[in-house]
Structures are given as structure tokens and as C-alpha cells.
């Protein structure tokens, strides 16, 4: 029997913890909010995120100090933009066995989470869990497939946690590739939401997603990463899902964006928009040449205040090229 800690009692953290708790594991979910902790422990519910759903009675919640040596597996599911502050406050100077990063985005200082974890934390093994996964569908038992990446060997022990659940795991051997895909697809999802709000049609949506996938593949190649992973669950799978549904926070942000005066005003809400947090720093992180990434460039321009219609026209008027 494994002892598991899921850090973060938001929608995704709660869903993940609930799936893991249905097996013969001792599962704890960590939350800052003492009200949520009490509700999970006393009522087996988290109505802030799942109003009409009962959680597994085996799932327990904790808050405050974390003693990492108590746990065989630790899943990080708080926003990526809180990772450095959280890890320094709660995880530093402790030994961690298996650490699974489930957040898609860049840290406060604009870095990949695995890079920070490797340098600043005492971790035996680091993994990335990524792919198309809306929390509501996962927690209600709908089939979901995810990529689990490790730089060392097949993550057999970690993947075994999901055996006989509604989550099917596929192995990947490149952590950074999966992380980059997770960061970038959130940015493109903002663009997809903007297009949807402009009612440009299904043809435009299909073309947009296809060309975004092409740009993502180019980024991987430019960064000396495995560009074939664009065909993975963490690549095209997550991109299609995130660019097609209002369940996606980044897509919804894009839909609302053109009706607001600025990204600053819209981002005042309490929902984490990882794509917005990453959009201004991704170029530096991957050392990108934006000349070869016209869609990404246009999304950045729109967020900075340029006309959406002008950016769409600029994309359509570009010189024809081979696919």
C-alpha cells in the first residue's frame, strides 16, 4: 500500500486524488484553505469545485507543514506560477522520493518546473503527468489517457497507481518535451478562444489548431527536443481539447478577452490562466525566433493591445508556403 500526497485541492488536484483514493492507497490532498480541508475530511466533498459529487471516504485532507518522508509519491497540482514560492516554503531541505508534476505552465521566474525542482529540491525521481484531462470528466469516471514522462526508465511504480482506474497511462522518456508542450498549448488556447469569440467559423478553428500544432512541432525542433511528440497525448491531444471547449480556462479567457479593456483587467479574477502567465516569457525560455512562429506572434501582439482583426488579416496575407 502506497502513501500518496496530492498538493492542491483545486479541481484537478481533487479529481486526481479521488481517483487514486479508490485503490488500496492512503491518499491525502493538501490545501491552504482550512474550510476545504474540513469539508473533505468531514463531508467527503469539495463543493467549491464539484457541487453535487461525493468524494471517496478514503480521501483525507491536510494543511500546514508537509513532512515529505511520510509519502512514497507526491503530486504537485497547484498552479505552476506558485511553484517556486511553495517549494521553498514547504519542500526545501527535505528528501522526496517520487515527485510528479501535474501543472502546465512556467514558474514565477519564467522557468520550467522540472528545472527548478532538479536544482533546488532533493528529489529521487521526477515525472511529468500531462495530456487532455478536464477534471470534471476524470472525477466522474470518464475514460482519460495521459502521458507520464521520466528521464530515466519506464515509470512502472508510478503508473501502477492508475491501474484499473479510468485513467490509462502512456509512457514518455522526455520530461522537458512534455513540459514545453503543456506550456505552449495554453497560449494557443487563448488564441482559439479569441477566434471563437469573433465567430470566424469551424474552418478557421480547424486551420488554426492545425497550424498551431505545426508551430509547436517547430518549437520542439528549434529547442533540440523530440518534435515527434507533437503527435502524443500531451501534444495534439491536449491542444485539440484545450482549443475547443469553454471548460478550458485559457480558451474561456480568450473568448472574454476581446470584450475587456486589457488582459490586466481580466486577469484580476481568481482563476489561474497559465497561458497568460507564460505568454510573455516563453520566447526567452525556449530562445525562440518569433519570425518563424506567426500565430504565436499574433497572440502576443493581441494581448499587448493590437487589433485582433489586423492580426487575423496579417496571418491570411502572409506569403504562401509548403506545409
PLM-predicted stretches and their roles:
Residues 1-53, 60-63:
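NAD(P)+-binding Rossmann beta1-loop-alpha1 motif at the extreme N-terminus of oxidoreductases
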Residues 6, 29, 99-101, 128, ...:
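Structural beta-sheet core signal
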Residues 7, 11, 15, 35, ...:
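Conserved active-site and cofactor/substrate-binding residues in soluble primary-metabolism enzymes
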Residues 55-57, 61-143, 158-160:
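Rossmann-like NAD(P)(H) cofactor-binding subdomain of soluble oxidoreductases
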Residues 106-201:
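Rossmann-fold dinucleotide-binding core
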Residues 142-148, 176-220, 232-252:
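Active-site-proximal catalytic alpha-helix in oxidoreductases
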Residues 192, 221-231, 239-323:
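NAD(P)-dependent Rossmann-like dehydrogenase/reductase catalytic/cofactor-binding core
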Amino acid at each position: 500500500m502506497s502513501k500518496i500526497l496530492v498538493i492542491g485541492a483545486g479541481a484537478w488536484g481533487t479529481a486526481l486524488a479521488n481517483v487514486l483514493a479508490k485503490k488500496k492507497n492512503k491518499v491525502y490532498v493538501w490545501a491552504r484553505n482550512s474550510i476545504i480541508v474540513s469539508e473533505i475530511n468531514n463531508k467527503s466533498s469539495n463543493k467549491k469545485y464539484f457541487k453535487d459529487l461525493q468524494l471517496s471516504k478514503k480521501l483525507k485532507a491536510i494543511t500546514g507543514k508537509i513532512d515529505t518522508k511520510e509519502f512514497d509519491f507526491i503530486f504537485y497540482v497547484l498552479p505552476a506560477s506558485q511553484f517556486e514560492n511553495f517549494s521553498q516554503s514547504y519542500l526545501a531541505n527535505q528528501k522526496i522520493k517520487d515527485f510528479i508534476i501535474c501543472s502546465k505552465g512556467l514558474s514565477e521566474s519564467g522557468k520550467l518546473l522540472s528545472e527548478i525542482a532538479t536544482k533546488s529540491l532533493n528529489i529521487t525521481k521526477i515525472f511529468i503527468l500531462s495530456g487532455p484531462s478536464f477534471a470534471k470528466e476524470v472525477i466522474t469516471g470518464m475514460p482519460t489517457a495521459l502521458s507520464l514522462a521520466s528521464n530515466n526508465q519506464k515509470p512502472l511504480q508510478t503508473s501502477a497507481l492508475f491501474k484499473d482506474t479510468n485513467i490509462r497511462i502512456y509512457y514518455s522518456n522526455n520530461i522537458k518535451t512534455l513540459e514545453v508542450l503543456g506550456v505552449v498549448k495554453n497560449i494557443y488556447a487563448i488564441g482559439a478562444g479569441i477566434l471563437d469569440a469573433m465567430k470566424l467559423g469551424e474552418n478557421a478553428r480547424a486551420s488554426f489548431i492545425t497550424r498551431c500544432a505545426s508551430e509547436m512541432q517547430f518549437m520542439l525542433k528549434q529547442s533540440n527536443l523530440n518534435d515527434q511528440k507533437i503527435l502524443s497525448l500531451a501534444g495534439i491531444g491536449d491542444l485539440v481539447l484545450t482549443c475547443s471547449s469553454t471548460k478550458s480556462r485559457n480558451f474561456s479567457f480568450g473568448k472574454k478577452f476581446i470584450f475587456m479593456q486589457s488582459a490586466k483587467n481580466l486577469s484580476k479574477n481568481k482563476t489561474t490562466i497559465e497561458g497568460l502567465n507564460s505568454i510573455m516569457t516563453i520566447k526567452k525560455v525556449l530562445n525562440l525566433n518569433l519570425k518563424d512562429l506567426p500565430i504565436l506572434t499574433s497572440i502576443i501582439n493581441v494581448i499587448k493591445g493590437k487589433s485582433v482583426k489586423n492580426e487575423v488579416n496579417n496571418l491570411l496575407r502572409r506569403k504562401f508556403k509548403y506545409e
